[in-house]
UniProtKB/Swiss-Prot annotation:
Binding site for ATP: H18, D170, G171, K172, S238, G239, R240, F241, D249, R255, K256, A272, K276, K280
Cofactor list: Mn(2+); Mg(2+); Co(2+); K(+)
EC annotation from Swiss-Prot or TrEMBL: 2.5.1.6
Assembly with partners or alone: Homotetramer.
Record keywords: ATP-binding, Cobalt, Cytoplasm, Magnesium, Metal-binding, Nucleotide-binding, One-carbon metabolism, Potassium, Transferase
Residues the entry annotates as binding Mg(2+): E12
Protein name listed in UniProt: S-adenosylmethionine synthase
Family annotation (HAMAP family): S_AdoMet_synth1
Broadest EC class assigned to this enzyme: transferase
SUPFAM superfamilies (alphabetical): S-adenosylmethionine synthetase (SSF55973)
Length: 395
């Protein structure tokens, strides 16, 4: 039998104690708090952090009465930043707040001062967004991304439940998968490399770190069928990672947009998600095209699919919609495009209603760590597959 042609593809993730992800979570915690009291809140909240300091800044127009400083401290504390030696002390760090109202120019262009009906609300900005889906995992997400993300989530789990008490909040993961291309569809064959770098306390040895990570993090996450004697493990390869969180590196909202989406697969229009209300198409547009791409694959129209949508500020209708199934479509892409346009409303006001995106609570903070897509949680409304009617070609 001829040797199968394979290739390697790598995705990375960071867990909730990474300084950039800390900032994403604070931005979304503030969005949640605003939406909970005032579903029409307009929020563009950025966060940055460095040693002993968190700053939030941006534009928020809301009727909600929100204690920004309390939300910042509560979010840091929940992640595990409770003392200087782990990288940040939630109760004693400096919290700076510089929040203004949304520009009236933007407000009148997008919302017409709230006189517009939902279908008339214009996009909050220009831009283009991509949604992607692939049949290689039950989540219809890329395996390299799913494994990197789940390793990061598991790292946090064993820290918080006390299984590995030496763990500290900051950590990064990376997974290389060997794939073969099956007529445009991606088929994972094995895991080639697993890399974990996690913050740890002073007491633990590198051998203990490696043993614990293999037993309590990798084993429960990576399915046995993908591991073999040739799989490479890099476990804390730098040798020492005691200083971490905002003390180790500065953090900023919107710096982890590939981790938030598809791990380098598909494509990305460049817009970040966290801290943005649903009139910002960077977020709502990306959510609706994920639902479209996922529905195409789940309905058997294709094994792999990418959907692009684009917008102009103040204009409700998208400027373009694009579909590519990488040659895996059961019917031509132009017919799939027609089905997508008939079944999905890409106008921002309608996306907000159809995906129920004005609901706050603890909804968006959940998206701000471990990925916005492929999650099994009723709050992730864009993961709900829409049934699509299509005529299967005669055999």
């Amino acid at each position: 039998m001829a040797e199968v042609d394979t290739f390697l593809f790598t995705s990375e993730s960071v867990n909730e104690g990474h300084p950039d992800k800390l900032c994403d979570q604070i931005s979304d915690a503030i969005l949640d708090a605003c939406l909970e009291q005032d579903p029409d809140s307009k929020v563009a909240c950025e966060t940055c952090s460095k040693t002993n300091m968190v700053m939030i800044f941006g534009e928020i127009t809301t009727k909600a009465n929100v204690d920004y400083e309390k939300i910042v401290r509560d979010t840091c504390r929940a992640i595990g930043f409770v003392s200087d030696d782990v990288g940040l002390d939630a109760d004693n760090c400096k919290v700076l707040v510089n929040i203004e109202q949304q520009s009236p120019d933007i407000a009148q262009g997008v919302h017409g001062h709230f006189t517009k009906r939902p279908e008339e609300i214009g996009a909050g900005d220009q831009g283009h967004m991509f949604g992607y889906a692939t049949d290689e995992t039950p989540e219809l997400m890329p395996l390299s991304h799913v494994l990197a993300t789940k390793l990061g989530a598991r790292l946090t789990e064993v820290r918080k439940n006390g299984t590995c008490p030496w763990l500290r909040p900051d950590g990064k993961t990376q997974v290389t998968v060997e794939y073969r291309n099956d007529g445009g569809a991606m088929v994972p064959i094995r895991v080639h490399t697993v890399l974990i770098s996690t913050q740890h306390d002073e007491t633990v040895t590198n051998d203990e770190i490696a043993a614990d990570l293999k037993e309590h993090v990798i084993k429960p996450v990576v399915p046995e069928q993908y591991l073999d004697e040739k799989t490479i493990f890099h476990l804390n390869p730098s040798g020492r990672f005691v200083i971490g969180g905002p003390h180790g590196d500065a953090g900023l909202t919107g710096r982890k947009i590939i981790i938030d989406t598809y791990g380098g697969w598909g494509a990305h229009g460049g817009g970040a998600f966290s801290g943005k209300d649903p009139t910002k198409v960077d977020r709502s547009g990306a959510y609706i095209v994920r639902q479209a791409a996922k529905s195409v694959v789940a309905n058997g129209l294709a094994r792999r699919c990418i959907v692009q949508v684009s917008y102009a500020i103040g204009v409700p209708e998208p400027l373009s919609v694009f579909v590519d199934t990488y040659g895996t479509g059961k019917i031509p892409d132009k017919e799939i495009l027609k089905i997508v346009k008939e079944n999905f409303d890409f106008r921002p006001g309608m996306i907000t209603i159809n995906l129920d995106l004005k609901r706050g609570g603890n909804r968006f903070i959940k998206t701000a760590a471990y990925g916005h897509f492929g999650r099994d949680d009723p709050d992730f409304t864009w993961e709900v597959v829409k049934p699509l009617k299509w005529d299967k070609p005669a055999a």
